């Protein structure tokens, strides 16, 4: 059976960043605990799951505080080309777009995500020069305990 490739393109949730108690704390979950790795184990050996998570990544926004390198749109095409052929791209972005400094509504953020989807659909980074399929994911509610 041919291997299939899933690209997980996201922010700190995809990266596996542990919730920070202080701005200087930068811990990461063990690779086996990160959601792309868990998904890869569940899918089985015929799937290659690639985690492309970057803490603070926005959908399409240059961050005036953290830098323009946090803009997911700027990084997307190079990452798609790096991992071709891709069967499925999972987008898990938008959380950092909620920062007060951006002043975006949920509708605004959905339009930002749409720009990423269109960029993927217009790419030739899937099988046989086609576009990969796209799945939009959102993190579940997190309840902090302890």
Language-model region placement:
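Short acidic/His/Gly/Ser-rich catalytic and metal-binding motifs that mark active-site loops
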Residues: 15-18, 58-61, 98-100, 143-146
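Short glycine-enriched, charge-decorated loop/helix-capping segments at active-site entrances
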Residues: 21-28, 64-68, 104-107
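Alpha-helical cap/lid subdomain in secreted, periplasmic
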Residues: 1-2, 33, 45, 69-146
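Serine-esterase "nucleophile elbow" of acetyl-processing enzymes
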Residues: 1-54, 60, 78-81, 89
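A general secondary-structure junction signal
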Residues: 53-56, 136-138
């Amino acid at each position: 059976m041919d291997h299939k490739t899933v690209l997980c393109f996201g922010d700190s949730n995809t990266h596996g960043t542990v919730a920070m108690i202080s701005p200087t704390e930068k811990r990461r979950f063990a690779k086996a605990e990160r959601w792309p790795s868990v998904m890869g184990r569940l899918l089985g050996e015929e799937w290659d799951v690639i985690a492309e998570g970057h803490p603070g990544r926005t959908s399409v926004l240059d961050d005036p505080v953290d830098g323009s390198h946090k803009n997911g749109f700027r990084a997307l095409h190079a990452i798609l080309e790096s991992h071709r052929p891709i069967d499925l791209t999972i987008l898990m972005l938008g959380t950092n777009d909620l920062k007060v400094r951006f002043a975006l509504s949920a509708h605004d953020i959905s339009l930002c995500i749409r720009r990423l989807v269109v960029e993927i659909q217009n790419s030739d980074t899937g099988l046989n020069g086609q576009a990969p399929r796209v799945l939009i994911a959102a993190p579940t509610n997190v309840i902090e305990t302890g």
